[in-house]
Amino acid sequence: MTSRQEGASSHGSRRSSRHVGSFIIDREIGKGSFAQVYMGWHKESKAAVAIKSVELERLNKKLKENLYGEIQILKTLRHPHIVALHDCVESSTHINLIMEYCELGDLSLFIKKRDKLITHPATHDMARKYPSAPNSGLHEVVIRHFLKQLSSALEFLRAKNYVHRDVKPQNLLLLPSQAFREERALPIMEASQDSLIPISGLASLPMLKLADFGFARVLPSTSLADTLCGSPLYMAPEILRYERYDAKADLWSVGTVLYEMITGRPPFRARNHVELLRKIEAAEDVIKFPREVSVTPDLKALVRSLLKRSPVERLSFENFFAHHVVTGDILGLVEDDIPKPPKRELETIRQGEALPSSPRVQMARQLSSDPRDTRSSPKSPRSSPRSSTVNSSADAAPRRQSQNAERRLSISSHNSGQGLGIQRPAPPIQSHTAPNHPRAADRSGREPQPSSLRVARQPSDVSLTEEEKAAQDVMFERDYVVVERRHVEVNALADELAANEKLGQNNSSAKSSPLQRRYTQQGSATSTTGAIPTPASRTALVAQGRAGQDRRSSYEKALSASPGSASSAISKAIQDASLRLFGYKVNTMRQKGSSPPLYQPFPAYPTPTSAGLLSDGKGSQVSDEDAKAAQAIEEFATRSDCVYGFAEVKYKQLLPMAPSMDYGLGGVSPDKGTSEEDGLTVDATVALSEEALVLYVKSLTLLARAMDIASLWWSKKTRAESSVVSQTLVQRINAVVQWVRQRFNEVLEKSEVVRLKLTEAQKLLPEDHPSNPAHQGEDSIASSAVGAKQVYLTPGISAEKLMYDRALEMSRAAAIDEVTNENLPGCEISYLTAIRMLEAVLDSDDEATARNISSGKEIAKDATQEGSDLDTEEAAHVRKMITMITGRLNMVRKKQQMIAEANNQAKHVSAMRRLSGDVTPRSVPSYGST
């Protein structure tokens, strides 16, 4: 034991104690984004455990909620193929999860080291009997074995309405076979008597356990979630599209894991989730396997049925659990793994039990069935082979199953976790639900298998380039991506407004129209979520992924419909200021193709006449409220556009080659690096990335404010609180909302690119550098407004300070031009842009302002300044600056008006002279007769 303690990692040696409760911390065996995993030992029994130690200081509020949620979930789960939680010990600085120790590591390492499995004692026999084919993945016997155990764990989770949301090879841990563990003198702490005994698959092969429930949550089969989380390479496309999703997202992840076990690599590889979605959409549900892969067609068909872009077309849980690949015998077994049917088991089979006719009836029945009936069904495709394949000895199989089958299938909480400090709730009535329950033997009609002749094998590049391997390793190290509900709300509201733009027509029948009745079923008017969930939205969700579905508004962004927007006032101001500050202009010319523009200015919409806004005069008060809401939305959009233009200056310096026409959305070519091309030092890259990131986040905040106001306004209108609304005004607001949605998605994608650029550059900084993440505290995380992704910023970096300095520079340069009477139109543009930036500095994320605006209350001049992060003196100074710049702006406009009037007067005089015939030049002498 002393030698084990001396072998502890340096990080462990810095901890105040080597003891955690009744356990001793040993060497470090793994490391994640927020936790270290150590091997540990129970003080008395000397049994091995895994200790997941999480440092509380590195977690923000969202991550702490995930951690405590993981603890609560693991306390209630007891299943042989789910990593069990033994104990939880919390201190002032750490939370230590004492969990089952899985000696062989995770499945991703198992796949990557498949050629060396024969050299490991625990996997030598497996690699000898079932070797991996060259340029391929694992042997099909091993694949089916792991699939059975994974499906067993997922079936148990579905019975409890859990969705894991992060199924990936890194979260599938492996144990040596039971026979190998018994030969070695390394005891492993068991959560229960059967927690280390597999209930499916082969007993001679390693045992798989599902781990890491940090993103898991209760999600009934009829519910939808809207938080984007999981690992990028294994995320379902509906999550990547920021759509609501259900538990079937886990089935996509299962398909990706299966594909990786078959081929040795993920089905889709990308640098970020935006590029990943593009590749998934481009594949169009055509999943190709390399020619070197030698697996049966039914296994390939199962993978293809799981990797369907549309959740509606994807294989259901019922059909997945009943699939013959999951329930049937494993083919190709050799030596002792060949099943030997027990003789005495035929005597205990019941023959009169009726089988369910549909998967739904079957699931409902299993949740309320007796456990004895569950395990003794005569035609269970999974229980029958289990009796002969789980234990290699034919004599031991019937005896072990007759003693432990009911306990295994019930996963009873009564016998698990005793004496380990875990208080577990009493099991519900349906807790005996078997993870592997009987099913009908004949399901050929329900599971049609495509002919293998129809699958055209395409040649594929087997050998991965070094760049692909590096990108794949980077994605393996990237634990997860979390995008909150706001992204779903923005797109949902924009789709709803676009679909119902003609709200203002037929105002007389607005209250009785079908459209109005449909929307009266929404939530309360005081909802603060911003998105209005409607049946129409869910109907649209069902149609996702079908042929003809157009999502260009969300991802392949159409260019602005505003004519001449590339030469708009704000664009010109940003270019002029960039020329003064950095020596070059930001190019705003549009390129052809679907790649989003580098800078798409906010379109200038034609202002409708007052008569159009006031309708027939009867609803003047309501129309005035609507006009105020529209004006507020446009003001927030304009401020956001100013901040976005400033961020684009930083982005252009950071990624001069991106986004290109070929690699839009802020991406770069996979075979071209940027560290050598851009010529920036590491310090400059970090500084530019930090500045661009905080500016993008500020722009997103302003866009979200605009959508909040639009959402509240739309909610009021759809509830018929006001039946008078101008169609012109609805079109005006809808146009702004569509622009905001387009810009929101674009900024979100670019901010992710900048974030990745920042984190990669920070890794290259010296340890003593002030911007090194090791020197950053929690304040620097929160200041980025994206703390869920653990982005560390240098102290002092803020969007408000950058915007204030930029506005000051632009106003000073404009003042010089004003004094010399040079470029007065440019002065006006610069003053306007500076005012908008300073207004954005004063703006805060206060939803009360949005409610006041949408409810028609009078908007104070500085309403958006309440709740600002600035102190009183700073806010007063910024307001004073706005007043001064506004005064200069008025002076410039007066000068322009005077010049315009003088020019018009001169033109008028010239025209009058031409009409009177006085066209003789006065400078030409007249020669008369003398």
Curated annotation (Swiss-Prot):
Boundaries of every Protein kinase domain copy: 23-326
Changes seen on gene knockout: Blocks autophagy. Leads to reduced conidial germination under starvation. Especially, leads to reduced CP15 levels in conidia. Impairs growth of the mycelia on host cadavers and considerably weakens virulence.
Described purpose of this protein according to its UniProt entry: Serine/threonine protein kinase involved in the cytoplasm to vacuole transport (Cvt) and found to be essential in autophagy, where it is required for the formation of autophagosomes. Involved in the clearance of protein aggregates which cannot be efficiently cleared by the proteasome. Required for selective autophagic degradation of the nucleus (nucleophagy) as well as for mitophagy which contributes to regulate mitochondrial quantity and quality by eliminating the mitochondria to a basal level to fulfill cellular energy requirements and preventing excess ROS production.
Protein name: Serine/threonine-protein kinase ATG1
Biased amino acid composition, Polar residues: 400-417, 504-531
Induction line: Expression is reduced when the vacuolar protein VLP4 is absent.
Taxonomic lineage: Eukaryota, Fungi, Dikarya, Ascomycota, Pezizomycotina
Reactions mediated catalytically: L-seryl-[protein] + ATP = O-phospho-L-seryl-[protein] + ADP + H(+); L-threonyl-[protein] + ATP = O-phospho-L-threonyl-[protein] + ADP + H(+)
UniProt cross-references to PROSITE patterns, sorted A to Z: PROTEIN_KINASE_ATP, PROTEIN_KINASE_DOM, PROTEIN_KINASE_ST
Gene Ontology terms describing biological process: autophagy of mitochondrion; cellular response to nitrogen starvation; cellular response to potassium ion starvation; piecemeal microautophagy of the nucleus; protein localization to phagophore assembly site; protein transport; regulation of autophagy; reticulophagy
Enzyme Commission designation: 2.7.11.1
